[in-house]
């Protein structure tokens, strides 16, 4: 009985910490606005790229975004409901048949383009 109370308590805390985020899935191009504290300054950094994977559920859910900068692939993993994420915008929707797009890492930048939904 006490475990049931504990589970309900965990679920209520999880529901309280969830943020409203737009629907997106692997293959979509998203723009993530991240709050950064640099000493006494606060600024917002934009990271735009292709969503490679999305995993977890509720508060522990994360997603990985990949972009090419100066010929080098950069991947960052963000918690979906993190307070440092100011905003997540979906730039375009992609058409893919996989849930995890790890194969994109081995493709050239031209070959890694994803078809867009119209």
Curated annotation (Swiss-Prot):
Molecular function as annotated in GO: structural constituent of ribosome
A GO biological-process term: translation
Gene3D superfamilies reported in the protein's UniProt record: 2.30.30.790
Keyword terms: Ribonucleoprotein, Ribosomal protein
Gene Ontology CC terms: cytosolic large ribosomal subunit
Superkingdom field: Bacteria
InterPro entries linked: Ribosomal_bL19 (IPR001857), Ribosomal_bL19_sf (IPR038657), Translation_prot_SH3-like_sf (IPR008991)
Pfam families the UniProt entry points to: Ribosomal_L19
Homology family: Belongs to the bacterial ribosomal protein bL19 family.
Function: This protein is located at the 30S-50S ribosomal subunit interface and may play a role in the structure and function of the aminoacyl-tRNA binding site.
PANTHER family: LARGE RIBOSOMAL SUBUNIT PROTEIN BL19M (PTHR15680:SF9), RIBOSOMAL PROTEIN L19 (PTHR15680)
Protein's name according to its UniProt entry: Large ribosomal subunit protein bL19
Taxon lineage: Bacteria, Bacillati, Mycoplasmatota, Mollicutes, Acholeplasmatales
